[in-house]
């Protein structure tokens, strides 16, 4: 029996080897591999159990004869099947089948393939894909069931919302007013602070906090930003008189502003106040962002209140990450001798107020450790007293760091980020509101002096307008000077011409100092004449050349040239000036040298801008005055005066 089994296993192994070689040569599709092995295994046998039973009765020779007969039949069937199925198969497969068909051994395995149905990949007709459930039209029952499911989901969501715990919180402001808020159970203290920032329009500083006050125990503390305010309020009793205040406390995040005061104060560092921002950040990262949070090393002698008594005992306490430890009497400060005073898992730290009066404490700088659910005096409350306020601040901050760890640092970074965004948006939103500094509003906060965009824009606009006005004024003054110079330059030419004409008429280059008195008389004589147009440019003090100003007095003299004397009865002053002006360009003789030499020295003395234009303005009316004087019946007086002046000017013989 063992020999038969061994021969049968050898036969099956040979058939497997033939199957593998056929797969390598013909490269059939991968989907046929499993089925071919199964058929190869069952070739010549309808039932494996029956064949095994038959092996016991039949001898090996008969079995081999049957196997050879089956192999020949299979070879014939494969040959006929390949002849029939060459057309639908690809030419490559057909050529391979023709090429590998003649050998007898591969035909044994191809018989197995002939028993399989055609592979699905060669079937040109595939079944249609299943319809899309989204695009498939739904029946009325399906629509009704879907609507019912939606209603059930909506009802469940509303039930969940109804189960959310909500509390009405009354927050006390600085000016004794209150704000009422609706707080849900998922809201943290940070969310409530952001809500209060929007309502009160404060400066969104990180020092703002919610401050819990428990009057019955005379304790108080500020809530941490990550705490759930609904859970905190759930610990209060129904008849509790505890209050929540919206205050600004610098102690909340002082450790992150000056970490050297808490982590390096006990090391005797001398440059605590001179630490730069980079070193501060590195110290904070090292203390809070490592594998474990570094708790400040605090060791001090504190006063402990005895249970049920108003007496205090001095003990030496040490702060560790797991809690507060103290040194028992007669023991050292080694770790094995330390006794655990309290752990921070289920306690909060509070500030004590007026404990010197209530419990006869050595100082008023006390802090309390108690469970949050304890709202009345109990033996489980721990009272500790410090000698100075700075030591109290160090211990309370160290306990907070040991209890909350890195969460405290995350709260600080979140407060800084939100505070910056809130202040930015509040500044943009308050551009339309401007109130006086220090005035109290109805929201319970003191108005802050916030520089709005509108005010800064108006200031910038005013500054720009002022600069524009200065530029315009400078530009306007420049063209005026340019326009004034030609008007003044136009005025000097007549004066030298008149002086030259007078000199030619009188044959004298200069006059004695008497013309000054004559000038005053003439100026006071005709007040009815309007001033000429070039008065305004004369106010700018752009005088003509010096000789022109001091040659003008001879024009004001009453005596006129001989042509004037001959035409005294018909005085046409404008034509005379026109003739002078018209004749002036043709003969432009320079003034005689003595006249400018004599007139140059008084320049600094007679630098009065109004007088030169007035003298020039009277040049035109002067002949008119003479004409009017002659018409008044006084021509003889004028002629006598002219003769007297000529006699005085004649050199003595």
From Swiss-Prot:
Keyword set includes Cytoplasm: yes
Presence of keyword Cytoplasm: yes
PROSITE patterns for the chain: PH_DOMAIN (PS50003), RA (PS50200)
Coiled coil feature spans: none
Pfam families named in the record: PH (PF00169), RA_2 (PF21989)
Cross-referenced InterPro entries: GRB/APBB1IP, PH-like_dom_sf, PH_APBB1IP, PH_domain, RA_dom, Ubiquitin-like_domsf
Domain PH intervals: 295-404
UniProt xrefs under Gene3D superfamilies: Phosphatidylinositol 3-kinase Catalytic Subunit, Chain A, domain 1, Pleckstrin-homology domain (PH domain)/Phosphotyrosine-binding domain (PTB)
Start-end of Basic residues biased regions: 605-614
Compositional bias per record (Pro residues), positions renumbered to this chain: 116-134, 585-604
One GO process term, biological-process aspect: signal transduction
A GO cellular component entry from the record: cytoskeleton
Domain Ras-associating residue range list: 165-253
Biased composition (Basic and acidic residues): 462-481
Region described as Disordered: spans on this chain: 82-141, 462-653
Keywords: Cell membrane, Cytoplasm, Cytoskeleton, Membrane
Subcellular location: Cell membrane; Cytoplasm, Cytoskeleton
Membrane topology, as annotated: Peripheral membrane protein
SUPFAM superfamilies reported in the protein's UniProt record: PH domain-like (SSF50729), Ubiquitin-like (SSF54236)
Function of the protein: Appears to function in the signal transduction from Ras activation to actin cytoskeletal remodeling.
Family assignment from sequence similarity: Belongs to the MRL family.
Protein name: Amyloid beta A4 precursor protein-binding family B member 1-interacting protein
